[in-house]
Amino acid sequence: MSLTIKEIKEKLSRIETLEELHKHEANNDSRKGVINAIKSREKNILKQQALEEHYLSMNQYENNIMSSNRDALICGIDEVGRGPLAGPVVACAVILEKNHHYIGLDDSKKVSPKNRARLNQNLKENVYQYAYGIASSVEIDELNIYRATQLAMLRAINQLDVTPTHLLIDAMTLDIDIPQTSIIKGDAKSVSIAAASIMAKEYRDQYMRQLSKQFPEYGFDKNAGYGTKQHLKAIDQVGIINEHRQSFEPIKSMMK
């Protein structure tokens, strides 16, 4: 008696390589449901392989450092929140375990909210060290966004329980006595920076959701402080709060 299509799908789901899939006896089954199941599994295997290859490519900076110092404590640093009209800029500093394996890790802007939340939880439970640094909207107005971002990053590093031996930073340099590499679009090129990007994004989004409970009219839970139509309308109707950046346009002009 032949297996049902459901049973064949279950067997196919355990196959991890294209070679194994192409050799499977299900390829001799002419039923349309089985043919579609094989195609679907092939697509999923190819997708997983692409994720694995991308993950390996994102380890190049870490591997170069580790090749000369196997005991290096490599810290990835990234920030979230430079562009919004409200809320802090949040940085995260992350030191991954040596044998890390977080498939799907990428620039937080490229990861779906569901996968970002899953990765964030996995990272928080398994990384060697992580810490956050925040620069408030007041500090952003006083310093400018670039310097406030540097401040948030330095605060994150200083919150770690260990001192990193090398910093991998997304497109910035920091005034700190630790060897560092600044990488343009680093959150898409370094697994350590990508981890920091994910964790900073999740932390800031949660902060803005909490802020939205106090000030629901601005829609912070949906816009994260960016200048959406709803947000700008609320500013025009009820004014600003301390979390708004008064040095940012159009708020700066609206305050005159």
UniProtKB/Swiss-Prot annotation:
Protein's GO biological process: DNA replication, removal of RNA primer; mismatch repair
HAMAP family with a match to the protein in the record: RNase_HII_B
Domain RNase H type-2: 72-256
Top-tier EC class: hydrolase
Binding site for a divalent metal cation: D78, E79, D170
CDD domains, A to Z: RNase_HII_bacteria_HII_like
Role: Endonuclease that specifically degrades the RNA of RNA-DNA hybrids.
Protein name: Ribonuclease HII
Manganese is among the record's keywords: yes
Transmembrane intervals: none
Origin species: Staphylococcus epidermidis (strain ATCC 35984 / DSM 28319 / BCRC 17069 / CCUG 31568 / BM 3577 / RP62A)
Enzyme Commission number(s) from the entry: 3.1.26.4
GO terms under cellular component: cytoplasm; ribonuclease H2 complex
Gene name of the record: rnhB
Co-factor(s): Mn(2+); Mg(2+)
Keyword Cytoplasm in record: yes
Stated family: Belongs to the RNase HII family.
A GO molecular-function annotation: manganese ion binding
Free-text remark on how the cofactor is bound: Manganese or magnesium. Binds 1 divalent metal ion per monomer in the absence of substrate. May bind a second metal ion after substrate binding.
Catalysed reactions listed for this entry: Endonucleolytic cleavage to 5'-phosphomonoester
Record's keyword terms, sorted: Cytoplasm, Endonuclease, Hydrolase, Manganese, Metal-binding, Nuclease
Pfam families: RNase_HII (PF01351)
PROSITE patterns cross-referenced by the UniProt entry: RNASE_H_2
Subcellular location(s) per record: Cytoplasm
